[in-house]
């Protein structure tokens, strides 16, 4: 009986250890090719490079707002990348909204590996960019999908 319990405990500890080692791969599912906004069907947008506080350059897509319109900041979900959310930007662009599709480290051809702190840094870089464009917080609409709700 003691041998069976010891075996079960060893198996359990092995499983816990394997999950600990693999947790990042289980948590983040980066993907999506690195395409241009035009190739993705949103020629109104342009690729911007955002420098994060840890020095990484992360690509995002941006279209400025028409006069008096707010800017939608879209933080995408776990699977895929900004290229997979291009169709979600089209209606807002059509109505003159500014749109920023936020890219993340390790997603869509961006350098780095995703992590909680890294994604926060990516989000902070987005906010800093909006400041440089003169877009006040009152004119920003933050939208998060899945993983993006935490950024």
What does each model-found stretch correspond to?
Residues 43, 139-142:
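Sparse recognition of residues in long alpha-helices and their boundaries
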Residues 143-148:
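Gly/Ala-rich beta-loop-alpha elbow adjacent to hydrolase catalytic centers
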Residues 53-133, 138, 150:
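Membrane-embedded segments
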């Amino acid at each position: 009986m003691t041998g069976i319990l010891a075996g079960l405990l060893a198996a359990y500890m092995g499983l816990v250890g394997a999950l600990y080692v693999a947790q990042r791969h289980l948590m983040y599912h980066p993907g999506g090719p690195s395409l241009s906004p035009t190739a993705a069907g949103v020629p109104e947008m342009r690729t911007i490079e955002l420098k994060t506080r840890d020095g990484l350059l992360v690509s995002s897509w941006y279209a400025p707002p028409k006069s008096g319109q707010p800017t939608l900041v879209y933080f995408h979900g776990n699977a895929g990348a900004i290229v997979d959310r291009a169709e979600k930007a089209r209606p807002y662009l059509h109505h003159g909204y500014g749109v920023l599709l936020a890219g993340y480290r390790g997603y869509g051809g961006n350098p780095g590996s995703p992590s909680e702190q890294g994604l926060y840094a990516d989000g902070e870089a987005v906010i800093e960019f909006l400041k440089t464009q003169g877009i006040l917080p009152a004119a920003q609409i933050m939208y998060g999908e899945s993983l993006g709700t935490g950024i």
